[in-house]
């Protein structure tokens, strides 16, 4: 997997942390220095932790697992959405629906409600109900779409979540931890990296920093998924070749059996002829 370089992280502004007075003590191992009242993140540490996260992301993609991407802050929304879509993963960019993970069964009911409304709207008899009812259903559908539209295909709990800004998305992190779902996250100097399984110390406020980290992670997931597809196709090809070989062996055995039967028949005929003589 191709890894980012120190200079790429530097150019993206991944090293800029928060004001020193807002720091979290557990981020101390990842802080390089203080400059003008701001903590500067050690990008060598960022590279090392990103490599760990990318390897784990590759493994999830290779296993065909689902990762839920979470980022509701303004500068992260579009980046999160595009990244998740590129690997066909669910994502949350609006307000986190409380209980999305810990009360997933109830959340699925809301998603099914949205699907039922879609079915009603596509039914020819939909035009027969009153205009007021149609308007109410349309509004209800729009509200559900805003909250659940990006996770409509998430039929079971994700195998992991990726979070941008764990302070803002603390509820998502808490739910994942409660269910022992691994958490990947971009962790800034104001947050606690010890509650995250795969913390990536970096600036979680600048759009370019978020995009740089996220694109690297997603590429690793994508590579894992593509390797999975390649391995499956190779296995299928081997099965076909094995089946063809087996078929050839079977044909040879049938032919040999036919020859043996024919020779045995000739032998029996010769014996009967001798008896008549």
Region locations from a protein language model:
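Intrinsically disordered, compositionally biased charged tails
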Residues: 1-3, 223-277
């Amino acid at each position: 997997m191709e890894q980012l370089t120190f200079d790429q992280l530097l150019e993206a502004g991944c090293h800029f942390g928060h004001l020193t007075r807002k720091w979290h003590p557990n981020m101390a191992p990842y802080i390089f220095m203080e400059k003008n009242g701001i903590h500067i993140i050690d990008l060598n540490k960022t590279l090392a932790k990103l490599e760990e996260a990318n390897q784990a992301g590759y493994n999830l993609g290779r296993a065909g697992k689902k990762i839920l991407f979470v980022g509701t802050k303004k500068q992260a929304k579009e980046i999160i959405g595009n990244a998740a879509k590129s690997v066909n993963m669910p994502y949350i960019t609006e307000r986190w629906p409380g209980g999305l993970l810990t009360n997933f069964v109830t959340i699925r009911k809301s998603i099914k409600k949205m699907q039922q409304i879609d079915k009603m709207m596509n039914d020819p008899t939909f035009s027969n109900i009153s205009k007021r009812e149609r308007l109410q259903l349309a509004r209800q559908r729009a509200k559900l779409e805003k909250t659940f539209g990006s996770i409509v295909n998430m039929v079971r709990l994700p195998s992991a979540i990726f979070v941008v800004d764990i302070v803002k998305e603390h509820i998502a992190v808490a739910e994942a931890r409660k269910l022992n779902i691994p958490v990947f996250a971009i962790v800034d100097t104001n947050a606690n990296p010890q509650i995250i399984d795969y913390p990536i110390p970096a600036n979680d406020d600048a759009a370019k920093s978020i995009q740089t980290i996220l694109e690297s992670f997603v590429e690793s997931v994508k590579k894992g998924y593509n390797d999975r597809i390649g391995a499956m196709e190779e296995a299928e090809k081997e099965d076909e070749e094995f089946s063809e070989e087996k078929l050839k062996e079977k044909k040879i055995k049938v032919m040999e059996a036919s020859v043996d039967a024919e020779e045995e028949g000739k032998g029996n005929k010769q014996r009967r002829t001798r008896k008549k003589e």
